[in-house]
Amino acid sequence: MPIYIVLLGPPGVGKGTQAEVLAEKLQVPHISSGDIFRENIKNGTEMGKLAQTYMNKGELVPDDVTLSMIRERFSRPDCINGAILDGFPRTPAQAEAVDTMLKSFGGCVDLVPYITAPVDILMERLAGRWTCRKAGHIFHERFNPPRRQGICDFDGSELYQRDDDNPQTVMHRIEVYKDQTSPLIDYYKERGTLVEINGFMPIDQVSAQLISALKK
């Protein structure tokens, strides 16, 4: 049976890092909704072009367009044993749509780790975050520094700091996330799949909590 995980947590909590740990442990891909958007837009797919028209107008991309792209990604051979979904769903309605989609693949959402940390820690983490230009790998000047300053350990590309990682924008992103995600947390709690993970710990200890949750 495939295993499907939805990873939740506010900006800066370390979802991307932990998703990679889980992906390696389970031998399934880490699928970020942001990466799916970028891939479809870059490749000029029908859904990518449609999404771009909404984005150009400053409008939200409709759920059916996003789900179509996610469905296509989940249908690829590397997802035969499952996948880790990050960045989507964000609302109960989207979660229901994901549930319906996964049923068509013979699976369901097996686990929803919700990684949390105090706001001041999230602010500190984001302010020191650097991102790989080529593949989006994330490093931190204090918590997870690259071996060579300014260079990605994985592909040797340049690391850069995103514009939205400044303090004011970060605080707004955290507040928006909490407001948007609260109903989603309740949705997964009711289904018994939500597991709260303490993200205010070293990376390996957070990973250990996730692995332990998988075994239950």
Annotate the PLM regions.
Residues 1-216:
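Glycine-rich phosphate-binding loop of ATP-dependent small-molecule kinases
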